[in-house]
């Protein structure tokens, strides 16, 4: 399963075209589609395995293997919803990295295109919880993201920055 996902990551960013309209590259496009579909299936199976141990969470659809520009995605994700609306924060299993250094993160996140006026405030409530071992914060501000160590001092600093709207969103990852 993980080998299929690792192999797919080396194709991230490649432009995909309909094989029937690709001329000499038809076989290459068929192979890319096969690699993408197999990797997505493997990631979906991984997410199902996780969800089977956490029955209170409902698995949502896995992201597609290519984006709207028809480039092979550099990652996959699957949301797990516990209760409430799709505007509520959820858990997300997310593939990240490159073939030589990749992993799966579990994070408190939300579906960006389905957020409402309260979503970011609700999601920032993760900063009201005490720090636990094995987590870190992924902070988004000014269109950039960066990793912040999960310490009590950083948690309090990030809470203040969220209040002052210096930070757009923050994810808790492990």
Regions found by a protein language model. Give the residues of each.
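Compact, glycine/acidic-enriched structural inserts
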Residues: 34, 100-166
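Short glycine-rich, low-complexity/disordered patches
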Residues: 45-65, 132-148
């Amino acid at each position: 399963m993980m080998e299929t996902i690792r192999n797919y990551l080396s194709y991230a960013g490649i432009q995909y075209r309909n094989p029937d309209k690709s001329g000499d590259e038809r076989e290459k496009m068929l192979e890319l589609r096969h690699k993408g579909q197999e990797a997505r299936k493997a990631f979906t199976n991984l997410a199902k395995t996780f969800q089977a141990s956490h029955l209170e969470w409902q698995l949502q659809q896995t992201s597609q293997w290519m984006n709207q520009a028809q480039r092979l995605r550099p990652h996959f994700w699957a949301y797990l919803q516990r209760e409430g609306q799709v505007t509520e924060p959820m858990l997300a299993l997310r593939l990240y990295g490159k073939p030589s250094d990749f992993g799966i993160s579990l994070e408190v996140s939300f579906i960006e295109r389905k957020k409402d006026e309260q979503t970011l405030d609700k999601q920032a409530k993760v900063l009201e919880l005490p720090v636990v071992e094995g987590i870190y914060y992924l902070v988004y501000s000014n269109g950039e993201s960066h990793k912040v160590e999960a310490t009590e001092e950083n948690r309090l600093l990030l809470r203040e920055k969220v209040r002052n709207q210096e930070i757009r969103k923050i994810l808790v990852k492990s």
